[in-house]
């Protein structure tokens, strides 16, 4: 077999180019049998196809002394090469390169030796020279088949497979219908001769049908190739040799430039790939050095042959920081180095929203080997610096707490002020004599960015519509939202594919990239489903299937199903949590399916509610871990004196009637109301020690820091109680969150932040007393650019909001200095909650409609 294999090169032995073939001579060059062939060059205006051929059939393509393959090249004007197979591979790759714009005609028969019946079915079609050569090679392979059913396998890049699938699978479906062939695109279990980024198009049927399908498939693949520039196909031995060299210790180049070796310890700064060498020194992309090669080992250089020039730059150019530079040069980097032992020491210096002590070191070289933490940054990537710094990074002056409070009031009033009105609150009891000072609670930046992941199922036939031609739709979704979208592989006996949306988010971000992406994907799936059922008439309902980790199902279900029941009532959609046994094969056994059925607006609103709860759950878990570490460093503030028995209300008023006394609680606004960004709160009294509405196994309720009486969402409610059972916030969590009495009723909120649906009002406990919430007033701050979605056309949305919820909705003019509008919603808790949900839905629907200006087709 090896004796008959043919290797082609782009030049003759004399070095002259053969104009007759268009690609050079086909004479064989003697090489070692283990040496791989060099990569083939695809000239401008040419297309390339890769056809898989079993080892047993290679001889039919090559022929004796290469006669067959030579005749094919001469008759088609194509470059045809049989690649060397990897060790143990049962297949070989046949690479075909020819002109894409030149036309030729081929006969679609069984083969050149077809019988009379086959000749009757022959038809002639016009194809390019590249397609014609592909058909000719396939005819040789089909002649070697032992049965009437033949299989053709094409290798293609992952980005080109979408062209074969088409929008919503329409292209591959039409080819199947026209030819009667079985066509599948495989991502897994590929032969070892395929590249890592390849997919395989497999066509099965009789010879005539497969050739017809091959014409259509090759046309799709040819149209998406970049024929206007030179490309490389085939084996890449230089790249493989280069990647293998990364695992060998190469220290000569870097040591010639550096007087001493540079060590990277596990706590120090791990350089990114593009920060290791000066720009323009590496011949390939920046991914030539994997991250793991920089961890716990000497910094290694790439082989000198892979560099365009010898690295003779100084240390600052090579490593982007001067190892032995003075302090001022070291501070030119974007990230400050702070000793770890100073990060958690109490201080009056505020760095961002965190209390830290910035201790100066005289030895800048020693700081390179100390643990450090990145400077907190906001959603726009800007550092949280609230004071000027000199050239050495030292604060020029320290802010007093009074100054901090005044500035934070304006800063916090704008953060999380948009549509942040879910009524979560927590009550504390203060000692009535002390008036201490409350330091601002630890910022969410200390929690760090969290990966927010949402998953949704889609049918296999609609997956192509989400991916788009060459991944166009996925790239646009990423560009629009910033989230990463991954469409899972197709599995046997599974009619669905899993779409995972991932985004790194911070609790301070006012919008969720992952949530926006999942809503756009759902709208896209609805559009695809609608286009396919136009012939069957309108459809009254649609089903969406979200995939939720089993560990997070509780925040969707709620205690006794109270949360999911409330969402069903609010959205009007049927929400069902399926058992693990009903999971499709494409999802893990650690996940469960949340199935939502209803009309499109209702299902979309339900998805918004569910993903909002899942996102809050991610950050609340992180906040709990952070608060457990930092609670000892915080102090609390007593808000009212010993004689006051009135609860504290910030931003909103809620009437509470006590069945025993039939009297209303008094309200007053705190001078520290900046803790509530949207100025909306739910005010009611209860004793923390005997609170029957918080599960004892969950010591920190959702969105609350018991150490500072602070909610991680600035727009949440902040209340104090006036119970006689006073306690101090410095007590252990086990005392603050005692087990509830066995007969205690279920109240307004649970640990997941859900709402009960009591018809007669919400029963609230305060020690041995009870109170019923009869009326709630909530203020919501809405940006001016979103008000058009609230009003709707000719005020239709606003009118619907009032009629459906039954709440009283008043829109106030914007205050001085801001364009945000204040929407006041009042009514029973059920009415206000329904109005808030509808308000969220209207704004989200408007934002989604604006996204249609992006061509997602």
Swiss-Prot record:
**Matching InterPro entries:** KH_dom, KH_dom_type_1, KH_dom_type_1_sf
Q: Name one GO biological process term.
A: positive regulation of flower development
Q: Where does it reside?
A: Nucleus speckle
Q: Which GO MF terms are attached to this record? A: RNA binding
Spell out the Low complexity composition-biased ranges.
Answer: 746-755
**GO CC annotations, alphabetized:** nuclear speck
Q: Where is the KH domain?
A: 46-110, 149-217, 451-521, 541-610, 775-839
Alphabetical UniProt keywords = Developmental protein, Differentiation, Flowering, mRNA processing, Nucleus, Repeat, RNA-binding
Q: Which domain of life is it from?
A: Eukaryota
Q: Which Pfam families match?
A: KH_1
Annotated region Disordered: the residues are 1-27, 644-755
| Phenotype upon gene inactivation | Floral organ defects such as reproductive-to-perianth organ transformation and loss of floral determinacy.
Sequence ranges of Basic and acidic residues compositional bias? 1-15, 718-730
The biased composition feature labelled Polar residues covers: 645-665, 673-688
Q: Does the keyword Endoplasmic reticulum apply?
A: no
Subunit-level organization = Interacts with HUA1. Interacts with FLK and PEP.
Protein role: Functions in floral reproductive organ identity in the third whorl and floral determinacy specification by specifically promoting the processing of AGAMOUS (AG) pre-mRNA. Functions in association with HUA1 and HUA2.
Put simply, this protein is called KH domain-containing protein HEN4
| Organism this protein belongs to | Arabidopsis thaliana
- Give the organism's phylogenetic lineage: Eukaryota, Viridiplantae, Streptophyta, Embryophyta, Tracheophyta
